């Protein structure tokens, strides 16, 4: 009998983030409360972060709220975004960086494997870099594992791919 498997990943589509940022920037240019505030949002794909800057702390918080609204309207889970502290910058401005979590960190991967083993479902879970591979002889066991993980709040948006 053949083995069946699927992968557990946690990825955010950077194209959707770019589109959300451009829509948010258009909204900012049209809003009266952001007039003459030199507000900006920049996506840094190398560091997986979004940099927000504006005239003061309140406007940076508003920028973050606008960004989250636009991301959620695109269907992007907000679990993978961790905001940093709002810092004062030169010229009386304020800035904030928002980290984008791509992949499953090692500690979360170990936690997921432990949850699967504690459930006593007949599956094997193995960590492969920033994703997990779950294998079993039964498709029903794999579906039970998916349902188990969907029911848990792990602080990450998990996607199930490569179902074979």
Swiss-Prot record:
Annotated InterPro entries: DUF520, UPF0234-like_C, UPF0234_N, YajQ-like_sf
Keywords assigned: Nucleotide-binding
GO CC, any one term: cytosol
GO terms assigned for molecular function: nucleotide binding
Purpose: Nucleotide-binding protein.
Sequence similarity: Belongs to the YajQ family.
Protein name: Nucleotide-binding protein Emin_0136
Gene3D superfamilies xrefs: 3.30.70.860, YajQ-like, domain 2 (3.30.70.990)
Superkingdom of the source species: Bacteria
Alphabetical list of Pfam families matching this protein: DUF520
Species for this entry: Elusimicrobium minutum (strain Pei191)
């Amino acid at each position: 009998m053949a083995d069946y498997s699927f992968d557990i990943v946690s990825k955010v589509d950077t194209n959707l983030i770019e589109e959300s940022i451009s829509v948010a920037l258009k909204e900012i240019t049209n809003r009266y409360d952001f007039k003459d505030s030199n507000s900006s949002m920049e996506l840094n794909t190398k560091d997986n972060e979004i940099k927000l800057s504006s005239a003061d702390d309140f406007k940076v918080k508003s920028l973050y709220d606008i960004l989250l609204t636009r991301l959620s309207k695109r269907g992007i889970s907000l679990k993978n975004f961790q905001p940093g502290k709002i810092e004062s910058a030169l010229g009386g401005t304020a800035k904030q960086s928002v980290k984008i979590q791509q992949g499953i960190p090692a500690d979360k991967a170990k936690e997921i494997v432990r949850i699967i083993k504690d459930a006593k479902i007949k599956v094997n879970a193995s960590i492969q870099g920033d994703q997990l591979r779950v294998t079993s002889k039964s498709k029903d066991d794999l579906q039970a594992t998916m349902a188990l993980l969907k029911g848990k709040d792990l602080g990450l948006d998990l996607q199930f791919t490569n179902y074979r």
